[in-house]
């Protein structure tokens, strides 16, 4: 059996450092959401890009079209860059694509800070979306491909924590500057966007490229060096390299090259691609994006006292859920958490929010109730849906097609986010339908349908190595059999005598 002393966090400290640097990417993504969502409720910003509206709670408003484009162009840019991620990853690698994202982020921010015209602002939002698409896609790929199976779930929980923590920091910065009467109200938050990409750009110089990507390129010596850097001192990295190489070679036996259409030509790869796409879309299906993107504006128009402070409370609630989830992940399967505790609860809270506002709209008491319910909803979403959807989506693709599959899945996930952020202003803006919190009526059935999909189609791969997951998909197991299936003499090895990339498979609890 493997030496437990080689499989501790302390033994893997260099891998934790590398992944700790990379998770600054989702922090940047969350920071952008937190900052931009609050700008649209700042008088200092609305004096430039909005119009005076005495009938609204803050005395200012922004047109539905501008509101749509400012928020949704970022997700549109993320959709575009994620769609093309497979092509970039095939030649450039994970780190190089993240370096490109840092540069795009800096250029976009220069444009947004120096203009007072709407069109350059749109261009800046699109460019920063391109950067965010790379940040989210390639940081996930790097973590999936470098972390040992035992800690993959932990790293992805940290990934989601950093996204939420970034959002919280963004909302706190907005709250601190919101009452400034001039352009500094939003220029200070925008200036903060430079910090993370600058640090990330320099820090990535000191960590290795993904070993799986290097091996996929045939650069075995470089892959071995990367594994030696990432793994404990006495780990059997030669064995791990051979396992990765054998798994890749086995997949490539049926194809002479790799292209985007390969995701759908083979029934096994088609299944894995659709599962990855479906897992990412769970976030959009929960309806969370309109609250995340417009929470300060949403609270302001619902006449909530101090909407920026309440946005901080909402972000903090989501962050607490992520921390609590890190203790849950060890005990419960992802499928159960996603199904029972995530989608169903989130859908019910969306329905309760809508009904509560429908019965007594516009009162301060209703506003306080909405904040409390929104916090509970965000805890359910962050702790149970967001924590697992990206994780599962990254585990589903085959190693040969991982860049293409996850890139397309991320792109469609961003497309879903774009659709919500683009259409939400029609529903919540007083100058349009003015539904406000009634928007929750749409998301209750969406959550229930998503929960049904998870129950019937999404397999449980908790504790499995990427090579073991490949073997189970190749055997065409039904989703319900993944949890209890025992692998003997297949990719990934047996349950005993695991290498450094393998992990004990916990005894599966019954559904």
Report each predicted region and the residues it spans.
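Short, well-structured alpha-helical segments
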Residues: 237-252
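Alpha-helical transmembrane bundle of multi-pass membrane proteins
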Residues: 1-232, 249-511
